């Protein structure tokens, strides 16, 4: 009986979840589920165990059928409500179910400068030929929690982004990959020094030059707060997530030209959510993300353990692909093709995530080219053709001159200066040896110096003798000294 009550309680939670996601929509399906749930709850009081088991199985099947049916009717705004729901998975769920071990750093819970930013050092365990390998990674992301108010809804303050940047540099020093998870509606609107925009810009500048692999996973990517930790080599996105420069409500306020105190209509918000193209499929088509991770029907929740296994495989695959793409090797192409197969278990493969100096330079160059290409693709250029050609030639010449200046001259300038110092020292030594015979003058040919002059130059003077030689002209007694003597 207690087991059935527990199942009924879980089904009631799923029904409340449907009501929250579809307010005022699909009322017939939701009413059918509510009726069947109440009916079976009454039947359990008088039916036999076999009948109760059959009723619970039929109710489970009905819930599954309705959820799959509603999954096909999801709108962009429905996905926004899924992402914002308290039952949505959070970063702590991912740390507990995707990684084998983790230790939170930079403060825990409320005892940190920003509870909305969680940073942890985690390990992924992989096996090959019976040998176990523990690969360390740095995991960071926005933590919304499940209704925890002190998390501030995942909106990070500037000092939280500063903490993330500090530990990114620590990961670069240790040479371990960085995994970031984006669960934020946007950065917290505060302009205390450093301001939100300034800190995000600093994070972007520093992340563009980090020499370790970076993988970002998007669930809720809102405005610049998402960009503060997501400039990565591989960008993945959950199938029910959204990634937008502004929230649908904010876009509706601008579109409707609302005055203070006014609220946008649900129809306008729905239309703005569709026009913003914020879903995972839209962002994949635009090229802003590299891969979509499929979730269960109506979004992933903490009890969907199969989804966490899928997420683990995708995270490992993205990290391996990033490392192999910049590593030189004869079989690199074959490994990359093998990694793209979905039926392979990456926990039974082992690829070292350590990069050489040359691979790190190629990694940074690839990352910078990727985001420069994305920025050019998002820009509508209406300049005349001749102006485009002239600017393109100027840019090409600037790239060539920069390569000559920095890749050739500046890179070897220190070595050249060291070589010149060594050559100068050797020349001085050679010159001294060549001129040494001419400097050996016989002692009797040196000019003679008067003994009195030698004594004055090589001995200390005596004060009494000096005063007598100067006949007391330098003697001075202050008036105060005369009074003291008297």
Segment roles from a protein language model:
Residues 68-69, 176, 240:
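A generic hydrophobic-helix recognition signal that picks specific residues
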Residues 69, 154, 273:
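Short, flexible active-site loop motifs that bind/organize anionic cofactors or intermediates
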Residues 120-208, 213-225:
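Cleft-lining beta-strand/loop regions that shape enzyme active-site pockets
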Residues 1-11, 16, 182-333:
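Conserved catalytic cores of soluble enzyme domains
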Residues 52-55, 160-162, 264-265:
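Short, motif-level signal for alpha-helix interfacial/capping segments enriched in acidic residues
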Residues 1-136, 144-146, 305, 309-486:
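Intrinsically disordered, low-complexity segments enriched in small/flexible residues
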């Amino acid at each position: 009986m207690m087991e059935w009550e527990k199942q009924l309680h879980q089904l009631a939670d799923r029904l409340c979840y449907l009501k929250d996601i579809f307010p005022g929509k699909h009322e017939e399906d939701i009413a059918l589920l509510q009726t069947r749930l109440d009916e079976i709850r009454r039947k359990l009081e008088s039916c036999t165990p076999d009948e109760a088991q059959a009723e619970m199985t039929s109710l489970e099947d009905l819930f599954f059928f309705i959820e799959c049916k509603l999954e096909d009717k999801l709108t962009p705004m429905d996905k926004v409500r899924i992402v914002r729901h308290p039952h949505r998975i959070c970063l702590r769920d991912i740390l507990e179910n995707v990684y084998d071990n983790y230790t939170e750093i930079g403060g825990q819970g409320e005892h940190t400068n920003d509870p909305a930013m969680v940073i942890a050092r985690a390990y992924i365990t992989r096996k090959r030929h019976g040998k176990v390998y523990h690969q360390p990674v740095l995991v960071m992301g926005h933590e919304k929690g499940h209704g925890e108010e002190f998390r501030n809804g995942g909106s990070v303050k500037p000092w939280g982004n500063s903490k993330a940047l500090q530990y990114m540099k620590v990961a670069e020093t240790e040479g371990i990959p960085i995994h970031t998870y984006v669960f934020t509606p946007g950065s917290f609107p505060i302009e205390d020094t450093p301001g939100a925009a300034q800190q995000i810009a600093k994070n972007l500048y520093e992340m563009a030059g980090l020499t370790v692999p970076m993988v970002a996973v998007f669930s809720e990517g809102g405005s610049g707060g998402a960009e503060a930790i997501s400039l990565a080599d591989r960008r993945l996105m959950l199938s029910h997530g959204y990634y937008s420069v502004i929230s649908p409500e904010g876009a509706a306020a601008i579109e409707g030209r609302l005055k203070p105190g006014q609220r946008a209509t649900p129809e306008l918000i729905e239309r703005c959510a569709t026009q913003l193209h914020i879903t995972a499929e839209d962002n994949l088509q635009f090229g802003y993300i590299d891969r979509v991770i499929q979730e269960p029907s109506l979004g992933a929740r903490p009890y969907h353990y199969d989804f966490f296994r899928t997420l683990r495989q995708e995270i490992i695959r993205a990290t391996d692909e990033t490392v192999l793409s910049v590593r030189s090797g004869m079989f690199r192409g074959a490994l990359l093709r093998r990694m793209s197969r979905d039926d392979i278990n990456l926990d039974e493969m082992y690829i070292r995530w350590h990069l050489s100096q040359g691979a790190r330079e190629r990694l940074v160059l690839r990352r910078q080219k990727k985001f420069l290409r994305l920025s050019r693709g998002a820009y509508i250029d209406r300049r005349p053709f001749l102006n485009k050609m002239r600017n393109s030639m100027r840019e090409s010449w600037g790239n060539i001159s920069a390569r000559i200046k920095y890749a050739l001259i500046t890179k070897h300038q220190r070595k050249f200066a060291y070589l010149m110092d060594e050559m100068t020292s050797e020349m001085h030594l050679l010159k001294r040896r060549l001129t040494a015979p001419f400097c050996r003058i016989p002692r009797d040919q040196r000019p003679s110096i008067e003994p009195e002059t030698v004594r004055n130059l090589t001995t200390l003077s005596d004060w009494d003798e000096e005063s007598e030689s100067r006949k007391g002209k330098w003697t001075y007694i202050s008036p105060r000294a005369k009074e003291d003597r008297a």
